[in-house]
């Protein structure tokens, strides 16, 4: 591959992602594999786990990746078609601490990509750009590595089933959206003692039923219809590569990740009083309040799973979660985001509570809030506007947080505007105790935004 064939736009903030056959080809992936192998060897790591999700391009791309890693002199262990968290698990289980998942996560079927962990660190930002620089400079190690195959699926299931215990049998609906979690999720929950109804658990990289992204309500319609037929304790939905979990209460309401986090935080803090819990800037104000109420220490941090993971590592916190649905349990687990494990922990805490799951969910704090709202810009344009907003913002009556965009917490609600790291959009989110407060906070943000750029077509 000449470097001219290396499209810079595939090197994203948290991973590598492109359109198969156009910006992401086997030849490109092979070069990236050699760069990852070179970087791993520079850090004294030469054994690398690789795995792939259920996309149609997976077998070709994982083979190219393995060739590239081997060309850098790495010993490659191919664990086959598995959820991304199983790749992370394998880096611990097999002691490699380095692994690459070939996955397009929740992107359309013609996309694929790489999530990369080297020496226990999930690559993001600069570290991902450095792989590109290595290839452009031809700063690549060569060697003759070997490629072997290993199956860690049973070890993964055993590890969870051996630790996460149900107090009573639960009846659950599981929707995998034809993503790669479809093989292991039903097995896991049956082994835990659940009665499982499967929706779209056949792995099919064309995603014929609905898109495997539980962050969007339209992708949860089928599961909601099934669960509200009655007799279910909960519904669980998984994203394309199994690192996020969506939750449906028996009455059909969506339990968004920041409200799920309240339950996980209480559970973890019941065993570790005073523990630290991390969440991202998009999460509800009630999460902060509930963590304090349960005797914990809340820490708000930047959105993005690699940022949250890094913060979790350096802080010694027990649990972290973000609004996108990535949840990281450090207590009893390894601190990586895993939708299947998150589902297992939810089932455990529901089964240990004397109340019916529907009551547990109903008792969670309720607020008036917006989903995530987006405003598109030309590439890079959103960063410039964000800088102007930060310079101009004045909210004397609010607690202002600027670790990731601008978040203003008022006595009765909050507003957030931040620049996305993955697409050229400004992201907004609003929450308040009532509709009047929500409108007031949105008005304040509206006037700030229009003072910076009067022609903005705001989504609120």
Give the role of each language-model region:
Residues 47-111, 158-159, 187-248:
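N-terminal small/polar loop signature for handling phosphorylated ligands or for N-terminal nucleophile
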Residues 1-67, 71-72, 98, 149-170:
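An N-terminal, well-structured beta->alpha segment
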Residues 96-111, 227-249, 254, 298-338:
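Glycine-rich phosphate-binding loop
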Residues 112-230:
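Gly/Ser/Thr-enriched, mixed-charge loops and adjacent short helices
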Residues 124, 198-200, 253-272, 338-348:
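Gly/Ser/Thr-rich active-site loops/lids in small-molecule metabolic enzymes
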Residues 86, 129-158, 162, 251-323, ...:
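Proline/glycine-rich low-complexity loops and linkers
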Residues 272-429, 434-460:
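Phosphate-binding and adjacent anionic-ligand microenvironments
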Residues 45-53, 171-173, 275-281, 318:
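Short glycine-rich phosphate-binding loop at a beta-alpha junction
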């Amino acid at each position: 591959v000449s470097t001219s064939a290396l499209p810079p736009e595939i090197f994203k903030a948290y991973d590598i992602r492109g359109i198969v056959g156009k910006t992401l080809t086997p030849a490109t992936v092979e070069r990236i594999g050699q760069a990852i192998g070179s970087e791993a060897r520079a850090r004294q790591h030469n054994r690398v786990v690789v795995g792939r999700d259920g996309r149609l391009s997976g077998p070709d791309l994982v083979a190219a990746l393995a060739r590239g890693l081997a060309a850098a002199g790495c010993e490659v262990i191919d664990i086959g078609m598995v959820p991304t968290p199983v790749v992370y698990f394998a880096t611990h289980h097999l002691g490699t601490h380095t692994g690459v998942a070939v996955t397009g996560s929740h992107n359309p079927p013609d996309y694929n990509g790489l999530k990369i962990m080297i020496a226990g660190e999930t690559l993001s930002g600069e570290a991902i750009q450095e792989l590109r620089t290595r290839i452009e400079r031809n700063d690549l190690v060569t060697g003759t590595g070997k490629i072997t195959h290993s199956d860690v699926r049973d070890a993964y299931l055993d590890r969870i089933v051996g630790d996460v215990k149900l107090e009573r049998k639960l009846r659950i609906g599981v929707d995998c959206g034809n993503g790669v979690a479809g093989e292991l999720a039903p097995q896991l929950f049956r082994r835990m003692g659940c009665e499982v109804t499967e929706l779209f658990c056949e792995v099919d990289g064309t995603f014929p039923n609905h898109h495997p992204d539980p962050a969007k309500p339209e992708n949860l319609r089928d599961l909601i219809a099934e669960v509200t037929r009655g007799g279910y304790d909960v519904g669980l939905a998984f994203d394309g590569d199994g690192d996020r979990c969506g939750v449906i209460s028996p009455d059909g309401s969506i339990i968004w990740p920041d409200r799920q986090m309240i339950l996980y935080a209480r559970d973890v803090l019941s065993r570790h009083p005073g523990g630290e819990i991390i969440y991202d800037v998009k999460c509800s104000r009630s999460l902060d309040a509930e963590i304090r109420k349960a005797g914990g220490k809340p820490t708000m941090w930047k959105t993005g799973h690699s940022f949250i993971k890094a913060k979790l590592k350096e802080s010694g916190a027990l649990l972290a979660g973000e609004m996108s649905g990535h949840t990281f349990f450090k207590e009893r687990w390894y601190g990586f985001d895993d939708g299947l494990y998150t589902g297992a922990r939810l089932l455990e805490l529901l089964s240990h509570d004397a109340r019916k799951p529907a009551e547990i969910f109903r008792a969670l704090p309720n607020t008036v809030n917006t989903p995530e709202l987006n405003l598109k810009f030309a590439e890079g344009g959103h960063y410039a506007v964000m800088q102007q907003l930060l310079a101009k913002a004045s909210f004397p009556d609010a607690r202002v947080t600027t670790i990731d965009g601008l978040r203003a917490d008022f006595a009765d609600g909050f507003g957030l505007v931040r620049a996305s790291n993955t697409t050229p959009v400004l992201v907004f989110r609003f929450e308040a105790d009532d509709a009047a407060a929500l409108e007031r906070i949105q008005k304040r943000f509206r006037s700030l935004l229009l003072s910076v750029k009067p022609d903005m077509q705001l989504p609120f």
